Amino acid sequence: MHGIAASQPYVIAFFLLWAGLMKLLSRRMRAQAGRTALARLSGPARAVPALRLVGLGELAVAAALLLPPLHLLDAVAAALLSAGFLVYLAYASVAAPASSCGCLGTHSRPVDVRAFARAGLLLAAALLTALGTRPAAPGAGAPGTVTGVQAGLEAGVKAGVKAADGLAAPVPAVIVLEVIVLLALSAELDRYWLTPLRRLLVRLRRPLAAPPQERVPLEASLHLLRRSPAYCSAAAGLTSDVLETWDEDGMRFVVYGARDRTAVFAVPLSGDDPGAVRVALVAEPPLSGSPA
Amino acid sequence: MRSRRDVLRSAVLGGGAGVVAATAMGSLGPEAAFAAQKTAQKVEPGAPDPDFAEGRIRSIKDNTLLVLGSNLVFHTIRVVDGTSLWKLGPVPFDAARPGDGLYARGVRMPDGMLAAESVWLNIVNIRGHIKNIAGQTLRLDHNGHEVLCHVVPGKSVAIHSESPPTADLSMLKVSQHVQILGAWRPDTNEVDIATVFSPH
Amino acid sequence: MARSKATDPPADLLGPVQGEVSWFCCGTAWGPCSSTGKGACGTCNSGSLQHAWPNTSDACWSITRPDRCGVSLSRRTCGYRHRVTALCSGASVVTAIADCGPQTDLFCGERSCCGATCADNRLIDLTPAAYSQIASLSSGLRPVEISSA
């Protein structure tokens, strides 16, 4: 458990470095800054500077976490940043539900439950770091004060540590699992693993490979009809959508209203020649009928 | 019905009685229509079209649909024999249900009623990325909202640009961008597919 | 994806340009449309004679990118009027810009035909009220000619 707590700064720093560098260096991300919820918060004109500012903050906290010695303040800053992410996500989902979060990279999807889960996990990691970090001794540098609350929490953590030690959890496995979960919760990476995985499953299972239909779908006939010279010659006079269709002798008949007349088309059920479609205008008012 | 269909069938296949040839209609050709476009449009561009209505059916009485527009304006829409109704394809009047969304085009009468020429029930035309394909459904990411699109055997087709439409939708791929024209299932995020337009 | 160099000057500057038209909903609406909003101009409504144009601003152009399909289009802002004419029927409608769209580059090279006439690439989107003046909503996609009104 000590190992897990000790490794959390690196896990958090990894994600903060990723987020900060993307915000500062990715031209595409800056181009899409206007479509993030941050733009709603800061105003579209200040979206890019705001993105850079957040990126700098993330890099600063990441550097503080990575550079020894690890100070309680570093962990508290990481926890505050993670809590800030959660507040920002809540704001985004309410105020700009269609906007993307602009967190770790470019994607157009709005904030969803995965983004909350990732930010929550990072917050938990930061809290674990804070609780596992011994405050600096007075006179050894920056001040660090252990409050009663923190002392209580530390006691809790120690109790937890003892319990966990009893379970002899394989620390590296837990850390790897944590990183995998955090990566899996990152929608920014979906195109590298989730989309190919889904494509592979579709290729293997072929879910939409329907058995050949005996009946030609009406939309297929209508598409051929709309491409036909016959339709062109009569389209300007049509006043309704399809009123009635039926199949007879290898043809599909399609009836439209044409003001006070009826336009009837004959579309071959086989073949793909728009020139084979025929039309006639019948001098009788259209009657709606049941579709075939 | 049979005899009427016979009349229409013989008209289009063999020149039966009562047929008016397209050329004899004069004004039906595209050239005439291109010329006619010079005439002024009744409705100011950008303004609401009084001959068009949008909303959800509140109630149905005889041949009249009482529709509450999404902008909270009521429309009374009269459906007559020559009115086409679409709900994943042409349907009879009794397919219309309270709760259905609709678009309607017709002629606005002096009493405010819309005499409908065409009514499209629950029609949606949405674009998005295919998130996943499973069973007979596509999960579409439409503006960040997931729409569950059902393939309807015998009705749904895919159109890959210039290729003829096909009932085989297995060419669709996860993450590709498509346009789906279909019928919304009221009060759900689900749509029955009429046509999937795929650029490739 | 058929990508080629954009035409220069804008294809629609000297005369009508041909392309595909589809329809989109906006404003207060039902179903999956209810989350759409009033569009980039803040005025878009499904029941009004309006359209979406791919070049209403720099931000809009960066999303739609018709140049990736080899088409350059003029910058036209909210309220600008275009006439859209169905290529075969000749039916036309004049509409005002109310939104940014369509995302031309996602459908690069797509072609729609009517008779012997074809048009490539999605260059304009009409509201249901406008689209249903020149074609049936159930057709979904039609070849058209676009000109300034």
Task: For every predicted segment, state its role.
Chain C
Residues 2-149:
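Secreted/periplasmic proteins
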